């Protein structure tokens, strides 16, 4: 992209006890600096809602170490990185023969079959059911024998060959050949009670961030799976109103463990799929949790195959400051799995919880005798440590006052990782490689490729890491490039969004400022979306866009076209975000500051940030607002209920209001248990309802979906009740049958239109 990005340097303002150091900031408003002479259109609310200006992605799926699949004009093409050419893998006309609208596809690892997904029906955040057909690529025809049942919950190819494992009605089945009958692996599945090979609600949302609980061994011989038992888990119930012709609303019931309630139990099994027989039932071998876990409630939180016959399991206590990794080997003579205590690796936290959200996954060397893992070092920063399976101690191979975000690939010579080391900016992401024979030899592969445009990268490696796709997300327009890891040479630009860049030349775009303030000798980063032709001598209304949950990050170098773009471009509102105590990727001291005390420091810091912004000279301190969604809705409500006098108004969407109402895994990670012996007092002292009286001083808009399975409508209902009880005049909006995302087309347009009207009224804008 050839956009003449500008750099804003200099001090925008000064504040008492605050140091402001300005870093390079990409300005998106191109052209004249004279607002009166700029006749270009602004980025409007309609532009956001209708997605007028679309960011182009480049999605690929690696199928070998040098080939990937991608879609173009609805054809599936295969690109050969070695020769630099593309060919048609499957024509769009082929899909027309199926008689169904194909939602997704998946190629078997041996390239012989393609799995076609249709009749997609969403369930929760990750889960869904669908129908599947298998297409034989050699015979160029659908397989009609022994088809996978409709309403299948999950399906996955083995890593090699073309075995299939799938879950239907909460039970697991395996196909050795796509056209042959399935082997049934489990017989205990029961809706909302026993889940085999798939997660229940809380494991899906808070532990695995996935619906699948199946793990193939690398050669496809063994299939590991988890079983979750929700028999004793309490149900959340809510009405689903559906079509207006429905005389009685449906009642949705979901096993949902709230803080302190009965949790699901978990068991883990492995089955040998090479020994399946149509005569006898499959034999699944259980691997039990370590004795240190069995003494109380615990979670299975990670499963990783080390070799064909070695598997690692990570277990976590319900109080999530203690985890154990078991490394288990297959004993062919007995058919059992042996997990030696001598190979257990314990991870603990004395200041908070283990991991960012859960313990990180291990990355094993080829022989399975050692692995690399991200853990906190003595200084409280998350870095890569090298473990040998028979030794307790590990060797850190990275260090510094920055953090490794993730390990991306491991070869015999190098380890590749993403970190935020570059220029000391926590909101940046770059790709590095470290030489395994000499840990002092570290190379940043992305830092200097296009530093003005690209400071936030993610990566996708080919099967053996010979090639990789770099995905730049900002601060400029997204850029996708292909590289060879042999010499780290850039091979080609896959997508540069040049068409969008040309369109945006004709739009008055806002600018983005990324900076930090120093409070109590600690850096806290913030970002500001500034109106076009920003003039620091003028006064602007300011909207604080907040999330502020544990390990969150709002101040980053990502390019976005969103609601804030409209507010800044068209309404001349500054939209700011601030990462205070509790935020992530800056060390445990900051992140663990809110351990066992949600609703305190992260709330206070948003108020203090607004105070400091108002001292910068260009903020109208009589027109400061705050808004947030989910945890951000909670913080917004706690801020407005603080009686600080800083904010005129605010919007809370789907907020938590009392932590005893939220799920056990998330809440207890940060708060412990709501018992007198543990942390009940703070549970009770951190509610929005206890601050109801102070809402008389502000304008408040409360929004929630009635079918929110995550943060239940109950949470907003209790806020509403408390405000009514003390006579607070406030606004409220509910969205019928909408879940936590309020994402249906009509609801999405309505909520952002409604919030825009509220903010404009609050700021006295026309």
From Swiss-Prot:
Write down the membrane topology: Single-pass type II membrane protein
Taken from the record's topology, the Cytoplasmic segments are 1-6
For this protein, what is any one GO molecular function term?
protein homodimerization activity
Q: List the disulfide bonds.
A: 328-339, 385-394, 444-447, 454-472, 649-762
Report the induction information: Up-regulated by IL12/interleukin-12 on activated T-cells. IL12-activated cells expressed enhanced levels of DPP4 but not mRNAs. Down-regulated by TNF. Up-regulated in migratory endothelial cells and in the invasive endothelial cells in tumors. Induced by hypoxia.
- Provide the active-site residues from the annotation: 630 (charge relay system), 708 (charge relay system), 740 (charge relay system)
GO BP terms: namely: behavioral fear response; cell adhesion; endothelial cell migration; glucagon processing; locomotory exploration behavior; membrane fusion; negative regulation of extracellular matrix disassembly; negative regulation of neutrophil chemotaxis
Give the location in the cell.
Cell membrane; Apical cell membrane; Cell projection, Invadopodium membrane; Cell projection, Lamellipodium membrane
Ranges that cross the membrane: 7-28
- Its EC number is 3.4.14.5
Q: Which reaction does it catalyse?
A: Release of an N-terminal dipeptide, Xaa-Yaa-|-Zaa-, from a polypeptide, preferentially when Yaa is Pro, provided Zaa is neither Pro nor hydroxyproline
Pfam families cross-referenced by the UniProt entry:
DPPIV_N, Peptidase_S9
Q: What class of enzyme is it?
A: hydrolase
Question: Which loops or segments lie on the Extracellular side of the membrane, by the record?
Answer: 29-766
Keywords from UniProt, A to Z, are: Aminopeptidase, Cell adhesion, Cell junction, Cell membrane, Cell projection, Disulfide bond, Glycoprotein, Host-virus interaction, Hydrolase, Membrane, Protease, Receptor, Secreted, Serine protease, Signal-anchor, Transmembrane, Transmembrane helix
Tissues with expression: Expressed specifically in lymphatic vessels but not in blood vessels in the skin, small intestine, esophagus, ovary, breast and prostate glands. Not detected in lymphatic vessels in the lung, kidney, uterus, liver and stomach (at protein level). Expressed in the poorly differentiated crypt cells of the small intestine as well as in the mature villous cells. Expressed at very low levels in the colon.
| Stored InterPro entries | AB_hydrolase_fold, Pept_S9_AS, Peptidase_S9_cat, Peptidase_S9B_N, Serine_Prot_S9B/DPPIV
Question: What PROSITE patterns does the record point to?
Answer: PRO_ENDOPEP_SER (PS00708)
- What is the activity regulation comment for this entry? Inhibited by GPC3 and diprotin A.
Consequence recorded when altering residue 85 to A: Does not inhibit dipeptidyl peptidase activity, interaction with ADA and homodimer formation
Similarity comment: Belongs to the peptidase S9B family. DPPIV subfamily.
User: Could you give the domain comment from the record?
Assistant: The extracellular cysteine-rich region is necessary for association with collagen, dimer formation and optimal dipeptidyl peptidase activity.
Assembly, per entry: Monomer. Homodimer. Heterodimer with Seprase (FAP). Requires homodimerization for optimal dipeptidyl peptidase activity and T-cell costimulation. Found in a membrane raft complex, at least composed of BCL10, CARD11, DPP4 and IKBKB. Associates with collagen. Interacts with PTPRC; the interaction is enhanced in an interleukin-12-dependent manner in activated lymphocytes. Interacts (via extracellular domain) with ADA; does not inhibit its dipeptidyl peptidase activity. Interacts with CAV1 (via the N-terminus); the interaction is direct.
Q: What does this protein do?
A: Cell surface glycoprotein receptor involved in the costimulatory signal essential for T-cell receptor (TCR)-mediated T-cell activation. Acts as a positive regulator of T-cell coactivation, by binding at least ADA, CAV1, IGF2R, and PTPRC. Its binding to CAV1 and CARD11 induces T-cell proliferation and NF-kappa-B activation in a T-cell receptor/CD3-dependent manner. Its interaction with ADA also regulates lymphocyte-epithelial cell adhesion.
The remark listed among the other comments is: Level of plasma concentrations of the soluble form (SDPP) can be managed as a colon carcinoma diagnostic and prognostic marker.
By what name is this protein known?
Dipeptidyl peptidase 4
Q: What is the lineage of its organism?
A: Eukaryota, Metazoa, Chordata, Craniata, Vertebrata
């Amino acid at each position: 992209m050839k956009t003449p990005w500008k750099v804003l340097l200099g001090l925008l303002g000064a504040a008492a006890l605050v140091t402001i150091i300005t870093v390079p900031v990409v300005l998106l408003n191109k052209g004249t600096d004279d607002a009166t002479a700029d006749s270009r259109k602004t980025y409007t609310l309609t532009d956001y809602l209708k997605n007028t200006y679309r960011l182009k992605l480049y999605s690929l799926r690696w199928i070998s170490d040098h080939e990937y699949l991608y879609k173009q004009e609805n054809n599936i093409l295969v690109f050969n990185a070695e020769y630099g050419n593309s060919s048609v893998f499957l024509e769009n006309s082929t899909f027309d023969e199926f008689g169904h609208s194909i939602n997704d596809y998946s190629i078997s690892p041996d390239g012989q079959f393609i799995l076609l997904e249709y009749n997609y029906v969403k369930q929760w955040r990750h889960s869904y059911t669908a129908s599947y057909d298998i297409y034989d690529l050699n015979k160029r025809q659908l397989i009609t024998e022994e088809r996978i049942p409709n309403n299948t919950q999950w399906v996955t190819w083995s890593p090699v060959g073309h075995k299939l494992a799938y879950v239907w009605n909460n039970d697991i089945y395996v196909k050795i050949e796509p056209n042959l009958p399935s082997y049934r692996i489990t017989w205990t599945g029961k809706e909302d009670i026993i889940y085999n090979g798939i997660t229940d609600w809380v494991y899906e949302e808070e532990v695995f961030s996935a619906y699948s609980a199946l793990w193939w061994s690398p050669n496809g011989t063994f299939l590991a799976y988890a079983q979750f038992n929700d028999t004793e888990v309490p149900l959340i119930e809510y009405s689903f109103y559906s079509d207006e012709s429905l005389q009685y609303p449906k009642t949705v019931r979901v096993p949902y463990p709230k803080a302190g309630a009965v949790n699901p139990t978990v068991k883990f099994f492995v089955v040998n799929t090479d020994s399946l027989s149509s005569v006898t039932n499959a034999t699944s071998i259980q691997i039990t949790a370590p004795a240190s876990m069995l003494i109380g409630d615990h979670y299975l939180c990670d499963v990783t195959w080390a070799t064909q016959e070695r598997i690692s399991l990570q277990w976590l206590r319900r109080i999530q400051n203690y985890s154990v990794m078991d490394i288990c080997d297959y004993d062919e003579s007995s058919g059992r799995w042996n997990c030696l205590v001598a190979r257990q690796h314990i991870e603990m936290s004395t200041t908070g919880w283990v991991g960012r959200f859960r313990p990180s996954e291990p990355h094993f060397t080829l022989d399975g005798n050692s692995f690399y893992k991200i853990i906190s070092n003595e200084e409280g920063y998350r870095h890569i440590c090298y473990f040998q399976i028979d030794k307790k101690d590990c060797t850190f191979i990275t260090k510094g006052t920055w953090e490794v975000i993730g390990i991306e690939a491991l070869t015999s010579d190098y380890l590749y990782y993403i970190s935020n080391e570059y220029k000391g900016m926590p909101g940046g992401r770059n790709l590095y490689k470290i030489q395994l024979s000499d840990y002092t030899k570290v190379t940043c592969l992305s830092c200097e490729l296009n530093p003005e445009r690209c400071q936030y990268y993610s990566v996708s490696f080919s099967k053996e890491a010979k090639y990789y796709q770099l995905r730049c997300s900002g601060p400029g327009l997204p850029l996708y490039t292909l590289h060879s890891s042999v010499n780290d040479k850039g091979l080609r630009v896959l997508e540069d969004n040049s068409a969008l860049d040309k369109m945006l030349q004709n739009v008055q775009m806002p600018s983005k400022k990324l900076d930090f303030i120093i409070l109590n000798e600690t850096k806290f980063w913030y970002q500001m979306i500034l109106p076009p032709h920003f003039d620091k001598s003028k006064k602007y209304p300011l909207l604080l866009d907040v999330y502020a949950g544990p390990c969150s990050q709002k101040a980053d170098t990502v390019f976005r076209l969103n609601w804030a773009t409209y507010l800044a471009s068209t309404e001349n509102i500054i939209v700011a975000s601030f990462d205070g105590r509790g935020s992530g990727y800056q060390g445990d001291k900051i992140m663990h500051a809110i351990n066992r005390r949600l609703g305190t420091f992260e709330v206070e810091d948003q108020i203090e940030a607004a105070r400091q912004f108002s001292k910068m000279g260009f903020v109208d301190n009589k027109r400061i607002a705050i808004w947030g969604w989910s945890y951000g809705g909670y913080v917004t409500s706690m801020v407005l209920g603080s009686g600080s006098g800083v904010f005129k108004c605010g919007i809370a969407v789907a907020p938590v209001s009392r932590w005893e109402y939220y799920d056990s895994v998330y809440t207890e990670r940060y708060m412990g248990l709501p018992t007198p012996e543990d942390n009940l007092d703070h549970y009770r002292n951190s509610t929005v309802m206890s601050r109801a009286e102070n809402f008389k001083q502000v304008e408040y808009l409360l929004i929630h979906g009635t079918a929110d399975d995550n943060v239940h409508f109950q949470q907003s209902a209790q806020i509403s009740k408390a405000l009514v009880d003390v006579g607070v005049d406030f606004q409220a909006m509910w969205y019928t049958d909408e879940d936590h995302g309020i994402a249906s087309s009509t609801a999405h347009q309505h909520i952002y239109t409604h919030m825009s009207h509220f903010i404009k009224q609050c700021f006295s804008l026309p």
